[in-house]
């Protein structure tokens, strides 16, 4: 699990590259600040929060917490484990230089890549890792 996630993340985020780690939750940031503090990896970060209030949202406002970080393979294994164990809300890591995003979740990862060519390149490289579902799900 960790090797694949680190391989994919290193390809999308680079190595020792500045990234932005984003966590999305429903509710206000102060409702979640204490729960983030329990994670060792979160203590290394300095989160800023944005709250998006939708008047029709039944789940309350959407809180996005973001922090700059340096991505290096293996350095964030505890974050990947917490995501795989479904201990976190939605997480996305953004490389501002490339514009690409690595969004791990408990069953894999979504990638938001800079071009269709890049999608084809990585789809070919990691074809053995992809789902056999016709839509790639």
Residue ranges and their predicted role:
Residues 68-110:
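Amphipathic protein-protein interaction modules
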Residues 93-137:
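Alpha-helical oligomerization segments
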Residues 1-85:
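Extended, low-hydrophobicity segments enriched in charged/polar residues
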Residues 7-14, 85-88, 124-131, 135:
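Generic surface-pattern signal
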């Amino acid at each position: 699990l960790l090797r694949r996630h680190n391989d994919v993340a290193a390809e999308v985020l680079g190595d020792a590259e500045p990234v932005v780690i984003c966590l999305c939750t429903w509710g206000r940031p102060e409702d979640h600040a204490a729960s983030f503090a329990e994670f060792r990896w979160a203590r290394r970060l300095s989160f800023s929060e944005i709250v998006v209030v939708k008047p029709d949202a039944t789940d309350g406002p959407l809180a996005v917490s973001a922090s700059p970080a340096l991505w290096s393979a293996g350095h964030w294994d505890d974050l990947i484990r917490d995501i795989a164990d479904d201990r976190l809300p939605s997480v996305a890591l953004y490389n501002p230089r490339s514009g690409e995003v690595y969004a791990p979740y408990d069953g894999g990862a979504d990638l938001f890549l800079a071009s269709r060519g890049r999608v084809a390149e990585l789809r070919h490289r990691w074809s053995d890792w992809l789902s056999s579902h016709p839509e790639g799900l």
